[in-house]
């Protein structure tokens, strides 16, 4: 919960999409011991974010029933009836649903289960230190070429501009139009990639399975 002596930060999880490339609601896909969206939600709940706005859309009732919401955190679930109009409609609803106390919103994608509490906290602290309108991570990437990603923090003073975005335009449009607004924070490793296709999902399942096996001290199949 919010501490009296620190700025209030909101987190907005965009999880309303129709998953057209996947062909089924990816929010509900099992990944380890939880559904895919629960991984993102759990990381946000564990972070220093003071509230979480979870934006649902397609099959909102089924998704809401599949996730666990802890009682001790301020979590607001909102349903975007216009999710077919693209991600911008969910971003707009999320910003408008955030607390009036909030000085910024950290934007997370509901199909990035590799996001971590540590990364969210690092970006939150970087935002507060930078004083910029936008702060985003810049991942090193396996190829050595820097790759921008999420979570992206947007200062309240540019929310009105973000609410004018249309279709599937995300904050990247604002960053392209106003590079002077942006501070990029170098982060080691690969970005927490989206789960857009069956192949993406299968790779995520394999990764989680391998982590579970290693954590238990067992030997992975095929390794001796």
Question: What positions do the PLM features span?
Answer:
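Short glycine- and hydrophobic/aromatic-rich loop-to-beta-strand nucleating segment
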Residues: 150-154, 193-195
């Amino acid at each position: 919960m919010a501490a009296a002596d620190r700025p209030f930060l909101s987190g907005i999880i965009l999880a309303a999409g129709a998953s057209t490339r996947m062909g089924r609601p990816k929010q509900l896909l099992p990944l380890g011991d939880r559904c895919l969206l629960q991984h993102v939600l759990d990381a946000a709940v564990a972070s220093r974010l003071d509230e979480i706005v979870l934006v649902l859309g397609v099959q909102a009732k089924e998704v809401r029933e599949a996730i666990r919401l802890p009682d001790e955190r301020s979590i607001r679930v909102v349903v975007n009836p216009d999710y077919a109009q693209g991600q911008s409609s969910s971003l707009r609803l999320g910003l408008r649903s955030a607390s009036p106390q909030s000085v910024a919103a950290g934007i997370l994608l509901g199909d990035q289960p590799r996001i971590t509490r540590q990364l969210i906290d690092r970006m939150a602290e970087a935002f507060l230190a930078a004083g910029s309108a936008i702060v985003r991570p810049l991942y090193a990437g396996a190829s050595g070429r820097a790759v921008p990603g999420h979570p992206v923090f947007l200062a309240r003073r540019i929310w009105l501009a973000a609410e004018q975005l249309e279709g599937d335009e995300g904050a990247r449009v604002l960053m392209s139009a106003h590079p002077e607004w942006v501070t990029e924070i170098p982060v080691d490793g690969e970005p927490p990639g989206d789960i857009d296709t069956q192949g993406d999902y299968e790779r995520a399942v394999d990764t989680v399975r391998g982590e579970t096996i290693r954590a238990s001290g067992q030997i992975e199949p095929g390794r001796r």
